[in-house]
Amino acid sequence: MIDTSDVEYFPTAIVGAGCAGLTLAHELINSKDFPCILLDPQKFRPEHAFSFWDDGHPHLTLARSLARKTWSKWEIRTFEETIQKSSSRFVYSTVSSSNYENYLFKKITENRGKILNARATDLYNTETCIRLETSSRNAVFANRVFDSRPPTPTNKTIFQHFLGWEITTNKSVFDETLVTLMDFRVPQEDGFHFMYVLPYSETCALIESTVYSDTVFKPKWYENQITKYLMNVIQCKSWDVINKEQGAIPLNYKKDLKPLGAPIGLNAGAMRTSTGYAFSQIIHQAI
């Protein structure tokens, strides 16, 4: 990322350079509200799979072009039954978070947008613009400010929490044409628990242990669940873990006392709390 050492004025400032902040900045490139500056103390972000339902809408054109894999068939499984569906209109797609965000970052900086590796600490309205104080001691001046920081969970929130392994196998064990959205053939004692399977090929897939509960577990818990699922349900005896991802999404949260600009992203209701999906809604907000 790029640091700015001098105080500068920007038509737009965005607090946070994650998915929501970068998506909005990219959408502003050809508008009068660009160039913009994004403020974020985090230099690197862990890899995640951004998955979404693609109905062919134009606002998903970029995401569609960057999709790692798409599926037109999906299923939900329990011990008692399997429900499979397919559609030519709705396609399930997944995008690598690093590929998506790196693409946006490149386009933003090529067009004179900037990233400041600093935390926004306060906001003041002046007679002519907005002044953002930062942890780098450099103030940022902008005409408009957007705040993409995630919301603060309440004390009694429910989380959708998960840990996933991307694995490779030496034998064909996955149907690469079929996404398993929820497989409930796993223990249910610790919460609403299912496995989520994105098969990238017959020998490569993301296997994610996902739970809805008020307690986030230690990594070993999910890893044990994935191991048992692979061995007992998938009937896979050996594999290599080539990537991991982990997260905890609060499904209810409180209003922050002082937003640093107009909220976007999760703080602006981009996530569907019943499912945890947010990617396509974040893009729709930006447009």
State the predicted function of each range.
Residues 3-4, 38-68:
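Conserved N-terminal glycine-rich FAD pyrophosphate-binding loop of Rossmann-like flavoproteins
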Residues 224-230, 278-287:
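An active-site-proximal "capping" alpha-helix that borders the catalytic cofactor pocket
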Residues 55-118, 123-125:
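A conserved beta-strand/loop capping segment in the N-terminal third of enzymes
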Residues 187-192, 246-264, 269-273:
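FAD-binding beta-loop-beta segment adjacent to the flavin cofactor pocket
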Residues 17, 27, 110-239, 252-257:
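Predominantly flavin-linked oxidoreductase catalytic cores and closely associated redox partners
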Residues 1-12, 31:
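Extreme N-terminal leader/targeting segments of oxidoreductases
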Residues 22:
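Residues forming the Rossmann-fold NAD(P)(H) cofactor-binding site
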Residues 13-19, 27-50:
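Glycine-rich FAD pyrophosphate-binding loop
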